[in-house]
């Protein structure tokens, strides 16, 4: 390399053109040190390029992961806020209303007790099995207000079940298109439940499908049958 530089400097000083190499000189093998130097330069350049790309990819990946963490945190915050507004607050409000209604509960119990004492003093005794509703009805208050001591809540639009709600809306829309009828969500759930039960074989005399009085009327031979024993 130094020889080539000296030659070029000498040519520039003398003002003569550099001597062109012959084809034989071009075809002569270069020295091993010269080839190693060229290979090292290429290797270093390739390594620097790879390192630069790797650093760039790592920075972009970290930036993307941080952004995803921020979005997930924000999504959880918004989901919790909607859950509090649609589920927690209405439920808490309803519970507080029922807790604060203890005065009405005491008043009703006192009235029921007074009616019972009046009837007992008049008749001498009172039996739940035998009573005349015209004279004394122990279930009068329950008939007048069947929702007493019951907390009736409107259906919640729970954001945690949004996927299930969307799926139910889609199925209900398909059912309405097939039948040409408009169904409420409650009606749709009843139809879906009936369709689900229809897939399984029904047992006419199963304990789950009978009332207590109906079960008492079932013959003892059926209750002690092999089928019932296996299903226990």
Swiss-Prot record:
InterPro entries: FAM228 (IPR040046)
Superkingdom of origin organism: Eukaryota
Family, similarity comment: Belongs to the FAM228 family.
Matching PANTHER family: FAMILY WITH SEQUENCE SIMILARITY 228 MEMBER A (PTHR28584), PROTEIN FAM228B (PTHR28584:SF3)
Protein name as it appears in the record: Protein FAM228B
Organism name: Mus musculus (Mouse)
UniProt lineage: Eukaryota, Metazoa, Chordata, Craniata, Vertebrata
């Amino acid at each position: 390399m130094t020889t080539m530089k000296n030659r070029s400097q000498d040519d520039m000083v003398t003002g003569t053109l550099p001597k062109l190499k012959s084809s034989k000189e071009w075809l002569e093998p270069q020295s091993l040190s010269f080839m190693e130097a060229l290979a090292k330069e290429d290797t270093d350049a390739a390594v620097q390029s790879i390192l630069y790309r790797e650093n760039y990819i790592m920075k972009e990946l970290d930036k993307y992961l941080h952004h995803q963490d921020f979005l997930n945190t924000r999504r959880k915050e918004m989901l919790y806020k909607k859950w509090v507004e649609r589920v927690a607050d209405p439920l808490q409000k309803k519970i507080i209303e029922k807790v604060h209604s203890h005065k009405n509960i005491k008043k009703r119990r006192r009235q029921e007790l007074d009616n019972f004492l009046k009837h007992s003093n008049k008749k001498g005794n009172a039996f739940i099995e035998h009573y005349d509703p015209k004279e004394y009805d122990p279930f009068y208050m329950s008939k007048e207000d069947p929702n007493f001591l019951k907390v009736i809540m409107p259906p919640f639009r729970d954001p945690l079940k949004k996927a299930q709600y969307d799926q139910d809306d889609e199925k209900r829309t398909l059912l309405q298109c097939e039948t040409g009828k408009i169904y409420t969500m409650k009606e749709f759930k009843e139809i879906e439940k009936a369709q689900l039960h229809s897939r399984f074989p029904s047992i006419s005399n199963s304990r789950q499908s009978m009332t207590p009085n109906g079960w008492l009327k079932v013959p003892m031979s059926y209750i002690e049958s092999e089928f019932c024993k296996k299903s226990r």
